[in-house]
Curated annotation (Swiss-Prot):
Record-given protein name: Probable cyclic nucleotide phosphodiesterase XBJ1_0953
Binding site for AMP: H10, D52, N82, H83, H194
Organism: Xenorhabdus bovienii (strain SS-2004) (Xenorhabdus nematophila subsp. bovienii)
Binding site for Fe cation 1: D8, H10, D52, H194
Molecular function as annotated in GO: 3',5'-cyclic-AMP phosphodiesterase activity; metal ion binding; nucleotide binding
InterPro entries named among the record's database cross-references: Calcineurin-like_PHP_ApaH, CNP_phosphodiesterase-III, Metallo-depent_PP-like
Chain sites annotated for binding Fe cation 2: D52, N82, H154, H192
Requisite cofactors: Fe(2+)
Cofactor remark from the record: Binds 2 Fe(2+) ions per subunit.
């Protein structure tokens, strides 16, 4: 099962507004064309968007996002990030009624169960998973324990070595890592860091996908960016492989 992971698209309030001299709409359009191209070569079973869809939580940005995602004609899960506004996203969903979005944020095939967990703290850049959400996640893991388990979320749980984002990562990362180790979760995917990374933690793989918008300059503690952008293709095969497509 091949899954595309998009993250940190940061669509601005209007198309002409750039973010650090980057037109995020142009990047998103390009990425969607690349996904179309990849779909002509191999089957993409699922797309997961792991947060910061819109930079300002704007309804029109969400409308653009949903229309582009629908054009890919592939089931997708959308997770919100700290830049998103849940109320506006829900308004747009109600108006647009997208066909391919998976509202449960759960997916499984014969071997894998994929789910999402909310890490957003309203009004804050850092992430935190509430006790209720941790308990619900554990319930889902136990219920689907006959599958290999993959979890996606917005905030990264392990430092990437870039202080500007490691200062606002997942605050209670230890709790979810211990939960995943307890239940032998195979994979954690996230965004937020604008810094692609892959770790192997005991028997689990953890991964931060490259941002669709821009990357932070690796190691920076001030606002310095790299204009490279991209996404990951994750092959949930017995060996589990990750291909980063960076442009």
């Amino acid at each position: 099962m091949k899954v595309v992971n998009l993250t940190d698209i940061h669509l601005t309030r209007n198309r002409d507004k750039k973010l650090f001299d980057v037109n995020t709409y142009d990047n998103f359009d390009f990425v969607c064309e690349e996904i179309h191209r990849i779909q002509n070569l191999t089957e993409i079973e699922l797309i997961i968007v792991s947060g910061d869809i819109a930079n300002d939580g704007d309804v029109e940005a969400y409308r653009y996002f949903l229309n582009k995602m629908e054009s890919l004609k592939t089931p997708y899960i959308s997770i919100l990030g700290n830049h998103d506004l849940n109320k506006n996203f829900e308004i747009t969903l109600a108006e647009e009624k997208p066909k391919y979005i998976i509202s449960s944020r759960e997916y499984n095939n014969d071997n894998w169960y994929i789910t999402a967990v909310d890490t957003v703290v309203e009004g804050e850049d850092y992430g935190f998973i509430t006790q209720d959400n941790l308990a619900e996640l554990e319930r889902k893991i136990i219920t689907n324990s006959n599958f290999n388990i993959a979890i996606f979320m917005h905030h990264h749980a392990m430092p990437v070595g870039t202080p500007i984002v490691d200062s606002c990562m997942l605050n209670n990362a230890k709790a979810i890592l211990e939960l995943c180790e307890k239940h032998r979760v195979k994979f954690i995917g996230s965004g937020h860091a604008h810094t692609p990374r892959v770790w192997h933690h005991n028997n689990m793989t953890a991964c931060v996908s490259p941002a669709v918008s821009f990357q932070w300059l690796s190691g920076t503690n001030t606002v310095k960016i790299s204009k490279g952008f991209g996404f990951n293709v994750i092959d949930f095969s017995p060996d589990l492989s990750i291909t980063s497509c960076i442009y």
